Amino acid sequence: MIGHLRGIIVEKQPPYLLLEVAGVGYEITAPLSTFYHLPEPQEEILLYTHLIVREDAHTLYGFHNDHERRLFRALIKVNGVGPKLALAILSGIGPDEFVHCVLNQNIDQLVRIPGVGRKTAERLVIETKDGLSRWHTNDTPSPEGLRSSNTQPTQDAISALMALGYKPQEAKRAIDAIQKPDLSAETLIRLALKQMVLGT
């Protein structure tokens, strides 16, 4: 098992990034909560990782801290929740907000995440509440000021939302509603998700 990787970011486009470690490029899938903390390409970063091995693929998932990784591991143990949905949850409302929803049994907010129906939301609360009640974190994502090296942040943001399960029209409408110029892709994604999932 690969516990963590320290290397140089070669490129990043949510939800994927390429990390070079000792001359080897690792393709890593990460939630948007992790992307909010990533530095610019060519800078060094430490990512906590989780490797999932299947017959047709070896997929490496990366996280900003161990709290995110532990939450991811707890999510994929829930019946009906796979890695893709776990990433959508972490990307949609973030680790701290998810813990808050579970501890307060806020089913209505959980079902606003693409792929999470009422039954799944109820299972998430039932199966993770005891474990999450012992978790605490003050590590809140703060994407403001982060810049994307991509020259098409709007298109990148729309693509990332589609990768999370939103329809193209929904993704475009959410991004278009953010009438603020010169924002990075990461900031556009965060603001769009805040509007769609949290309703603010």
From Swiss-Prot:
BP GO annotations: DNA recombination; DNA repair; SOS response
Subcellular location: Cytoplasm
Region (Flexible linker): 144-148
GO MF annotation list: ATP binding; four-way junction DNA binding; four-way junction helicase activity
GO CC entries: cytoplasm; Holliday junction helicase complex; Holliday junction resolvase complex
Region of interest (Domain III), residue spans: 149-200
Annotated Gene3D superfamilies: 5' to 3' exonuclease, C-terminal subdomain, DNA helicase RuvA subunit, C-terminal domain, Nucleic acid-binding proteins
Function, as annotated: The RuvA-RuvB-RuvC complex processes Holliday junction (HJ) DNA during genetic recombination and DNA repair, while the RuvA-RuvB complex plays an important role in the rescue of blocked DNA replication forks via replication fork reversal (RFR). RuvA specifically binds to HJ cruciform DNA, conferring on it an open structure. The RuvB hexamer acts as an ATP-dependent pump, pulling dsDNA into and through the RuvAB complex. HJ branch migration allows RuvC to scan DNA until it finds its consensus sequence, where it cleaves and resolves the cruciform DNA.
Sequence similarity: Belongs to the RuvA family.
Quaternary assembly: Homotetramer. Forms an RuvA(8)-RuvB(12)-Holliday junction (HJ) complex. HJ DNA is sandwiched between 2 RuvA tetramers; dsDNA enters through RuvA and exits via RuvB. An RuvB hexamer assembles on each DNA strand where it exits the tetramer. Each RuvB hexamer is contacted by two RuvA subunits (via domain III) on 2 adjacent RuvB subunits; this complex drives branch migration. In the full resolvosome a probable DNA-RuvA(4)-RuvB(12)-RuvC(2) complex forms which resolves the HJ.
Name this polypeptide is given: Holliday junction branch migration complex subunit RuvA
Gene label: ruvA
